């Protein structure tokens, strides 16, 4: 009589394992997808912070070099009773000027606006980021507020899907720059 080799799995046992794995994947997938989305938004916010810091470097470099040809500068603004100088650079200017190195630079558009205090009673410079990478948008959020969790949600001033920037070009007049500052202050509390 021949011995039968019973060391393998039956078809039913293999199907049961496949069904259990499928159920586990279906349960875990929404959590993993949510984590991936939050990571992408977090990376985008970090990019916004790096663009704002690059604008700080560009402004400081232009002052040291005594050049006014870097970005857009408007002097004599008054916001909330304090005097400011407006400085703005587009993201493409930051990249082409060597202030930021990006492999996927063409994916980013937008501006970084800086309101630099010119009076002694003003606290710190205000850097406002408005940018998109064709997947997410930041509209008028200050550098100090960018890292906060409240901006990792949808809504005005926050990070959200889409490609619609409120301000995609630098102000060209003092009146426009001052109006933007007042709007940023009202909507997002950037000048408090």
Regions found by a protein language model. Give the residues of each.
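Short, surface-exposed interaction loops/tails
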Residues: 117-192
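Extracellular/periplasmic head regions of type IV pilus-like filament subunits
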Residues: 67-134
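N-terminal secretory signal peptides that target proteins for export/translocation
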Residues: 1-4
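Membrane-proximal N-terminal amphipathic helix
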Residues: 37-66
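N-terminal single-pass transmembrane signal-anchor helix
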Residues: 6-33
